[in-house]
Amino acid sequence: MGGGKGSWPIAGTAVYMTSYPRTEEGRPWEEILPVRKWLYQTPEQILIKASNGASDFGNKFGQPLICGSVLTFEHKEKDEVYGYDKVIMLAGGVGYGTQRDCLKGTPEAGNKVVVIGGDNYRIGLGGGSVSSVDTGRYSSGIELNAVQRANAEMQKRAYNVVRALCEEETNPVVSIHDHGSAGHVNCLSELVEECGGLIDMSKLPIGDTTLSAKEIIANESQERMGLLIQEEAIEHVRKVAERERAPMYVVGETTGDHRFAFQQADGVRPFDLAVEQMFGSSPKTYMVDKTVERHYEMPQYEVSQLHEYLTNVLQLEAVACKDWLTNKVDRSVTGKIARQQCQGELQLPLSDCGVVALDYRGEKGIATSLGHAPQAALADPAAGSVLSVSEALTNLVWAPLAEGLDSVSLSANWMWPCRSQEGEDARLYTAVKALSDFCCSLQINVPTGKDSLSMTQKYPDGSKVISPGTVIVSAGGEVSDVKKVVSPVLVNNEKTTIYHIDFSFDNLKLGGSAFAQTLGKVGDEVPSVQDAEYFRDAFLAVQELVNKGLILAGHDISAGGLITTLLEMCFANVEGGMEINLDKIKEQDLIKILFAENPGIVIQVSDKHKEAVKQILEDAGVGYVKLGKPTDERHILVSKGDATYQFGIDYMRDVWYSTSYLLDRKQSMNGSAKKRFENYKMQPVEFAFMPDFKGKFSQYGIDPDRRTPSGIRAAIIREKGTNGEREMAY
């Protein structure tokens, strides 16, 4: 909303990372560390309540949540204890703005400073004690006072005003900024940064009369927007705000004196600084650290335990079904959602990316995806960064991007335990440089991101748990045709072939994998991308296949490895399976083949198109291997040499779904979660057009442009607290 002179958010994303929720006894990987005396909430409570908050906000604001991720992790290596006791909760999203409004205007003396939204309360005044200091360092009162919150219904009203102004022929907004960290002092100062401004504190809305001047200036009640408006347009903006039931306050103006001040009614200025003091060049900070080599034991395994390994991997929260998340959030509001999480006739959350259309009838859209690899980053921070970018891109590749990789922009959010132990600052530098170098080689930009560099939880007994250094990469790009997005659901057609396409150009490695995690290991040998140019070529070759409609189904290889990818392609169906032969893969270690998380994808191609597909891949110099074909049998047969293994799809799907059930039963009532677990596979969705359907408006006498009145009148009521009115009106 705060981009340029105003923009339109369309859909949201969310990521949750915690320590193990321990929803069921008997999971050996959850027994490596003892249960701690959690400072505020248990991991299980955080997973449920945090996702409730994201879901509730999206439902109230009218913004669908269409893409997300979950990771749980704990580990002990010698005396080092790792885990997301200090949790990560990331919310993001996609939207767009007009070219006219993409850049902020230049403020001039006399522009009015406007705040739209709710009142000031004692919210978020604990400073950086949540994001910039180890949790547990300060008293619980200070830490809890740092918690922010936002009123979705109020923010929707503020958004309606911004949207209305952006849709006018002449946008009166000079500049706009959201209220986040540091409240008014941050938001309003950035509006007037180029010329200075004076804020009348008596005009700021006060919801709590006991607030001090500092609390009024710096609280983080986040359902507000700050705008710089041309003076002659103030009354017009006020009328728009009144129509939208959005509280609007003219709280100051730009001055031209290059000072930024808050002034009370009695003339006292509790805050008065030169703009240069706030935004001038900061003194250089020198951080001295040294590289510390840490080694992580590799997992030991036996092929004879393959089925046990697989059932364990499928139960990890990062791999398992996310139905407990998707069944409680709106994934379709706006009427512009072209791809959300749930796929196939069983509508299971399997999508690699989320896609929105820009309007109700056009083909253009926006795709978004996520990537992270913190386990790998423990052993090799550079590889962890590369894998995070790679996962985001192999998730995004299924949408036909308007200009291939040139359409893609990334956001990198860094959560790192700096100063928690020697060598972490150096590891962060290595990780950031690796991500920068990889993206430069791919010729994609990373224009935005955030950081939290104190990812350590300290306990009263003196113990501490270090969160793994983590970068979460969000990818977005313009889509040329939302109808061409490839689904991960296998098409039950024996006249098709399944291929593996390698993006890593690296040997198969188990370090940093979900497989290693279930064995309580991390492993020193982690995969990476050995050739960024090759990765780019592979991405663009697959994009060509997508644009030409040559891929029937496709899925990325990430958490859980190749075997999880193959199973997930079958989970959303009620019939059919695969017969897979791995002899053409050079690696002889079956466990590595099935569970390594080297970047790559699996595609299904019609036999009549396979020569064209091969030609495109070979022309691009991209490696591929034929894996097998779909079958009528409800299992996946995997053979390597003389050995053959059978995996029952329906059984493995229940194993995969069980973790969702265990979390769902904690958030639902009256045994609903159990009923859903017992019946989710019994209700395949079928949709068929009438035999005479031609797919044309004219068949039903409908003019999509509404040039001829129908004579029927309908009223759409739009009031505060409502959403979805535009799609209903259309």
Protein language model features and the residues they cover:
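Glycine/proline-enriched, intrinsically flexible loops and inter-domain linkers
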Residues: 1-730
